[in-house]
Amino acid sequence: MSELLQAQSLFKSYRRRVVVRDVSVQVATGEVVGLLGPNGAGKTTTFYMMVGLVRPDRGHIFLQQRDITALPMHERARMGLGYLPQEPSVFRQMSAADNVLAVLETLPLSPVERQERQEQLLSELHLHALRDTKGHSLSGGERRRVEIARALAMSPRFILLDEPFAGIDPISVLEIQRLIRDLRARGIGVLITDHNVRETLGICERAYILHDGKVLTAGSPQEIVDDPMVRQVYLGDQFQI
């Protein structure tokens, strides 16, 4: 049975300006969902409320039917909610292998278990050839692979990806899409927010389109593209997947 990450009736205001109004979003394990919209639509604020970076004024976040609205990010992580920020999160002066090990050392594992898990993650993310490469020398796509390996070290049930396609070349985009498919195949639920609409819709089963702080529509990528209102306020008439 699928587990759920749910945002229910979220509201958020800044200086009396409502930026998110009655937004509900749901992600199941084993599916990839997009959270998209034009600038100022409220998608980033909604995303940050689900991550735990921003507290909603009203509404609730549920993880596996437990209300986590008031929990800090590290408690959400322990419950299975992973987060990859847009900004580089690898340690620049540490090797790729040591970046993964740094996360494993926070878990109650024996040295042998840590080493075995480290090698497993390096293998699964095709990082063996980069194991001794320092974080500052990694390309954008390589860095993303290390960051995903670090996130997987916590055995998450859900991973929230903030702008995963930003600042990487077209070949790396394909690699990141493949990695996201691998996450889905593992049964992990993935929520993506990104300004690269075509790349995001190309990997999602469903997407939510926010506009003026509200959910304008939700559906499959093709349903999103075919929606006249979405084309009017966001995609334009010439957009194709």
Swiss-Prot record:
It is a peripheral membrane protein. This is Lipopolysaccharide export system ATP-binding protein LptB. Keywords: ATP-binding, Cell inner membrane, Cell membrane, Cytoplasm, Membrane, Nucleotide-binding, Translocase, Transport. The keyword Cell membrane applies. Residues 5-237 form the ABC transporter domain. Gene3D superfamilies: P-loop containing nucleotide triphosphate hydrolases (3.40.50.300). Part of the ABC transporter complex LptBFG involved in the translocation of lipopolysaccharide (LPS) from the inner membrane to the outer membrane. Probably responsible for energy coupling to the transport system. Its EC number is 7.5.2.-. Its main location: cytoplasm. It comes from the Bacteria. Pfam families: ABC_tran. GO terms for cellular component: ATP-binding cassette (ABC) transporter complex; cytoplasm. Belongs to the ABC transporter superfamily. Outer membrane lipopolysaccharide export (TC 1.B.42) family. InterPro entries: AAA+_ATPase, ABC_AA/LPS_Transport, ABC_transporter-like_ATP-bd, ABC_transporter-like_CS, LPS_export_LptB, P-loop_NTPase. It comes from Acidithiobacillus ferridurans. One of its GO terms (molecular function) is ATP hydrolysis activity. ATP binds at residues 37-44. PROSITE patterns: ABC_TRANSPORTER_1, ABC_TRANSPORTER_2.
